[in-house]
Swiss-Prot record:
EC number(s) from the headed UniProt entry: 2.3.2.18
Record PANTHER family: AMINOACYLTRANSFERASE FEMA, LIPID II:GLYCINE GLYCYLTRANSFERASE
Subcellular location: Cytoplasm
Record-linked Pfam families: FemAB (PF02388)
Protein name (Swiss-Prot/TrEMBL): Aminoacyltransferase FemB
Length: 417
């Protein structure tokens, strides 16, 4: 085996293998986004004796104190069950970094530590061997965190396993609320379409509204546009919306049908108890439809014919479709836009041969007092599998300068206080 820099083509061909479980940050498109942010990029990997790539990683070189922080965002990519290969990679990476002005290196691999069911019952053993291997190479582990951290990628995820399933069989595994709300969205006639680059502001409007409502930390517009600009068809932006003209027409047709049926039944003499109950039920439905029709007509008058309900940013790579971020309108939440969007994207996975639908981030704190308990409950209702990643690892390469860097950083933080 040999450790080497890789060409873009070598890197791309390797990470296209879905069995390697690569992340959307470890794709060739991310080279352009990192360079657009002003960072140099280097692709480092391992080749076997037949010159085949068996490990790869995209590193950003972040200028710091006359040196570089080497950060592989969700790398490296390899068969991490092969501890011998991981050991070789880390050992050779250390040699490379000592020769290339590295201050310190950060790795946060897309590698599993443990898997749980939706109720946090373990399904696998803990992968302590992998964590201990990093530590044996001098890496500091950021810990088994159970909260969001702006300096780290998420460590917990909610994932749907689609392998061997159909939309119908998968839907049976959802809880009653998920099933009911998906059906509501369908009955309302909610549609989903993909936004073009020129329409991305429609996503941002919903995203900013959700940010203001929830108080969650958000990304800048430029952050999103960087991906939109460079990721091409690997970034998907669905928009769930309702066309009130179509909905009102559907309501009116349904109302007319119910009124005609009620009138026909009323015209009959000697009505049975069963018929009287049916008439009473139709009267309730007619009253409901009239209220819905009035509300929809008023909304069309004040808010327009098209109501944008929910939107999201998704990344698709060889391994999965990943829900990165989203937003929705609280004013129109009765139309169940987020449910329509997620159900549409789950079906997109089936239609395009994906075996994983990743709802992505969770804090790891599953208690009722946690900051994202509502998010967990939402994802839990889809019967997700909870995946815990191994976390962040740091290693100082230039130890003297690293000590100085940390000392200055502590001083700066004290001055801010």
């Amino acid at each position: 085996m040999k450790f080497t820099e890789l060409t873009v083509k070598e890197f791309e061909n390797f990470v296209q293998n879905p069995s390697l479980e690569s992340h959307y940050f470890q794709v060739k498109e991310n080279i352009a986004t990192r360079e657009s942010d002003g960072f140099q990029v280097v692709l480092l990997g391992v080749k076997d004796d037949d010159n085949r790539v068996i490990a790869a990683s995209l590193f950003s070189k972040i200028p710091t104190m006359g040196s570089y922080v080497y950060y592989s965002n969700r790398g490296p990519v390899m068969d991490y069950s092969d501890l011998g290969l991981v050991d070789f990679y880390l050992k050779e990476l250390d040699k490379y970094l000592h020769q290339h002005q590295c201050l310190y290196v950060k790795l946060d691999p897309y590698w599993l530590y443990q898997v749980y069911d939706k109720d946090i019952n373990p399904l696998t053993e803990k992968n302590d061997a992998l964590v201990n291997l990093f530590k044996s190479h001098g890496y500091d582990h950021h810990g088994f965190t159970t909260q969001y951290d702006s300096s780290s990628q998420v460590r917990w995820m909610g994932v749907l396993d689609l392998e061997g399933k159909t939309p119908a069989s998968l839907r049976k595994e959802f809880d009653s609320q998920r099933k009911r709300n998906i059906n509501k969205a369908i009955n309302y006639g909610v549609k989903v379409r993909f936004l073009s680059k020129d329409e991305f502001d429609l996503f941002l409007d919903l995203y900013r509204e959700t940010e203001a409502r929830t108080g969650f930390a958000s990304k800048t517009d430029d952050y999103f546009y960087n991906f939109i600009e460079h990721y091409g068809d690997k970034v998907l932006v669905p928009l769930a919306y309702i066309d009130l003209n179509e909905y009102i027409q559907h309501l009116q047709e349904s109302l007319n049908d119910k009124e005609n049926r009620r009138d026909d039944m009323m015209a009959k003499e000697n009505k049975t108890d069963k018929q009287l109950k049916k008439i009473a039920e139709l009267d309730k439905q007619i009253d409901h439809d009239k209220k819905e029709l009035l509300q929809a007509s008023e909304l069309r008058q004040t808010d327009g014919e098209i109501l944008n309900l929910a939107s999201g940013v998704y990344f698709a790579n060889a391994y999965e479709v990943n829900y990165f971020s989203g937003g929705s309108s609280e004013k129109y939440n009765q139309y169940m836009g987020p449910y329509a969007m997620h159900w549409h994207m789950i079906n997109y996975c089936f239609d395009n041969g994906y075996d994983r639908y990743n709802f992505y981030g969770l804090s790891g704190d599953f208690t009722e007092n946690s900051e994202d308990y509502g998010v967990y409950r939402f994802k839990r209702g889809f019967n997700v599998r909870i995946e815990e990643l191994i976390g962040d690892f740091y290693k100082p390469i230039n130890k003297v300068k690293y000590w100085l860097f940390n000392t200055l950083d502590r001083i700066r933080n004290k001055l801010k206080k």
